[in-house]
């Protein structure tokens, strides 16, 4: 526990938006994009592990519960232009709604970067949890315009996205601690997104015994992320219960 706290503290000091420390010579850059209602802090441990693996890490924050998707995408574009325009290759690792943000970004700026993308628990085809609660005035305030657009209907933000025209790997969980949400979701889920709704056509796909909020903190997930960024492949199809935490 103490080691994890130290790693997180160091990560917060080192991984600061678009001002990372000098990377190793020849290091490739990975952009981290967090999920709905989260901050850069949620990706700090994963960022530390990617840094240890030799990547230059840029951990991007954005107002996930306040801005519409269009503004979030433009904010991401501006932040990447400020720090990464001279790079030949740029990878992305996302959590939850961050995956939808990056898919929208790459759909509009498809020639900007040539790297790989790993999405953790993305609502690639929406979430039944949004369907159930998006009409609540309180939840609409809490989720914001982008979050309430993550439903499963054909007009939702994720279901209006075109094919992913980049190398993509998806990792999602099949464990839950939110029984109410899971009651709303058919089939295996991670407490927020059904396993089947995380899939993206043509993408490599891996299921792990993890919950939605903490999948990014698993050491075995970080290892699979590194594998995909380096080779375009995961090392296995499914991870055992005993591996990692979260």
Q: What residue spans do the PLM features occupy?
A:
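Serine-dependent carboxylesterase/thioesterase catalytic core
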Residues: 24-34, 40-41, 45, 51-63, ...
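Alpha-helical transmembrane segments and their juxtamembrane interfaces
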Residues: 12-13, 44, 71, 131, ...
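Sec-dependent N-terminal signal peptides
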Residues: 4-14
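Helical cap/lid subdomain of alpha/beta-hydrolase-fold lipid enzymes
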Residues: 107-246
């Amino acid at each position: 526990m103490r080691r994890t706290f130290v790693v997180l503290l160091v990560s917060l000091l080192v991984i600061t938006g678009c001002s990372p420390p000098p990377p190793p010579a020849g290091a490739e850059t990975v952009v981290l994009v967090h999920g709905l209602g989260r901050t850069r802090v949620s990706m700090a441990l994963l960022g530390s592990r990617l840094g240890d693996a030799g990547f230059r890490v840029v951990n991007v924050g954005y107002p996930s519960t306040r801005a519409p998707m269009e503004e979030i995408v433009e904010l991401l574009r501006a932040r990447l232009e400020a720090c990464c325009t001279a790079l030949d290759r740029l990878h992305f690792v996302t959590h939850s709604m961050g995956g939808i943000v990056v898919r929208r970004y790459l759909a509009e700026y498809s020639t900007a970067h040539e790297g790989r993308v790993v999405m953790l628990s993305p609502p690639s085809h929406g979430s039944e949890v949004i369907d159930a609660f998006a009409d609540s005035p309180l939840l609409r305030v809490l989720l914001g315009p982008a979050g309430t657009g993550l439903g499963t209907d054909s007009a939702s933000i994720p279901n209006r996205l075109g094919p992913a025209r980049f190398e993509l790997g998806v990792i999602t969980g099949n464990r839950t601690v939110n029984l109410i949400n899971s009651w709303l979701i058919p089939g295996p889920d991670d407490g927020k997104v059904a396993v089947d709704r995380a899939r993206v056509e043509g993408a490599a796909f891996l299921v792990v015994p993890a919950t939605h909020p903490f999948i990014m903190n698993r050491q075995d997930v970080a290892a699979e992320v590194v594998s995909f960024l380096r080779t375009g492949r995961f090392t296995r199809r499914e991870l055992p219960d005993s591996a990692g935490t979260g």
